[in-house]
Amino acid sequence: MRKSFGVFLLLATVVFACTHEPFFSLDNEMQELIGDLNRYVLPESDDLASIPQSPANPLTPEKVNLGKMLFFEPGFGVEAMHPEGMQTFSCGSCHIPAAGFRPNRMQGIADGGVGFGLNGEARDKYPGYAASEIDAQGARPLSVLNVAFVSNTMWNGSFGSGGVNIGTEHRWGVADPGTAINHEQLGALEGQNIEGLKVHRLLYNRELVEANGYKA
């Protein structure tokens, strides 16, 4: 009995001795790295003054409402590879709200795609298009959610004259001709969208704007 009690006492001592002290130093280090948590709180959608924007193109409620319509407007998809694809695609073809503003399938298809389903899951290659003719990017489209807070856009951060691209001016427009737009000192998102219109076979001009009812 005395031996059993001794073993129990020894085990109890070992257990309590192994109790870890709180990692206060690690917590402090994490807090320093994170900084002020308030900087991670996004502003309300109508608090336009708190959303990053280009001074040359400030946000207004009218521009926001226009953008919401243009995002899903297929009327400007007139640079299609084949007549069958004319005006059958928009930004919303590949950036699906219900899918986090990304494709709801393995890859998004703009021009050269057909169908949609409920949330983009049924879009597929149009039979009349060769695989090499469809507008599908080499990498999955990024989400366009909250991209106003992104200083450099695209997977490799190639668009935008600020942020990580400061000091890389000599490379703009060299390996990727589209990045020459960075020399215009536009916001990353604006520069990418201007080039994106060409890449995604969209065209905006006065005639189409009026024809689609966006200007009286």
Write out the residue ranges for each language-model feature.
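Periplasmic c-type cytochrome electron-transfer domains
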Residues: 18-216
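Bacterial Sec-dependent N-terminal signal peptides
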Residues: 1-24
